[in-house]
Regions:
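Extended charged/polar low-complexity repeat regions
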Residues: 1-248
Length: 248
């Protein structure tokens, strides 16, 4: 759906079960207007630590200087890598202000009011181009990693979960995924037609997705499963699922 007008600011969400999320925004500074805090229905408060591209570039330069000045430290940071202070203002996905989520902290839990975590619940690192590089859990262990095409900003060519083999992706000239390769699992091929996508796995099973709409409102309205059954879906004007009919 299209973004709300500038004078309308999202302050909270309530789901069908009455559970709430209240959003708190920074009033000033480099991330003014961005959500930097969340309070859930149980009264727990979370701090969202945000960084700008300039802040990440400065941190990179400091890390590189430390690495180069210490003979004992591993050369994990390339001395030739460029980390710009700014990102291109516009991308094929829309405007990019360079602000990224760096960490999520639990700052208050009514069930344990006297306990404060000493580490974030999750932490995120990014490439010099602002792409998500890795996700770390509260123990500091990397749980996800991503690799991108050096010639196409934002195009993910591989990702992996901790302890699992890396999945890789191939694209056509228009930037659509044509193949997903999983070393210890099924591989998938993707073929694109008019308002449809055909997915075939390495066991030659096929599914077909039929779509309607354009841009951000494009939705799958029918799915033909490998066993011949069909699932149909209906959406409202905002693109939200309102009904689904399965083979039964």
């Amino acid at each position: 759906p299209p973004p709300p007008p500038a004078y309308r600011v999202l302050t909270g969400v309530v789901d069908g079960f009455g559970r709430t999320l209240a959003f708190h925004r920074a009033a000033k500074g480099d991330v003014a207007g961005a959500v930097t805090g969340v309070t859930d229905g149980a009264g727990r408060r979370f701090h969202l630590a945000l960084t700008t591209q300039a802040q990440r570039a400065e941190a990179f330069r400091k890390q590189r200087a430390t690495s180069l000045s210490s003979p004992a430290s591993p050369r994990s940071v390339s001395s030739s890598q460029v980390f710009p202070d700014t990102l291109p203002a516009g991308t094929e996905y829309g405007a990019d202000n360079g602000i990224r989520l760096e960490a999520v902290w639990l700052t208050h839990d009514p069930a344990y009011p006297d306990e404060q975590p000493t580490a974030p619940l999750a932490r995120y690192t990014y490439t010099a181009g602002g792409e998500l590089r890795a996700v770390y859990d509260r123990s500091g262990m990397q749980v996800r990693g991503f690799t991108y095409d050096a010639e196409h900003a934002g195009r993910m060519v591989a990702h992996h979960y901790a302890g699992r083999p890396e999945s890789r992706y191939r694209y056509d000239d228009t930037g659509r995924v044509t193949e997903q390769v999983n070393p210890e699992g099924l591989d998938y091929r993707f073929e694109y037609g008019q308002d449809r996508v055909t997915i075939t796995d390495s066991l030659n099973r096929r599914e077909v997705l039929y779509t309607e709409g354009e841009g951000g409102l494009k939705r799958v309205v029918k799915k033909e499963h490998a066993d011949g059954s069909i699932t149909r879906s209906e959406y409202d004007e905002a693109g939200r699922l309102k009904a689904q009919t399965d083979a039964a």
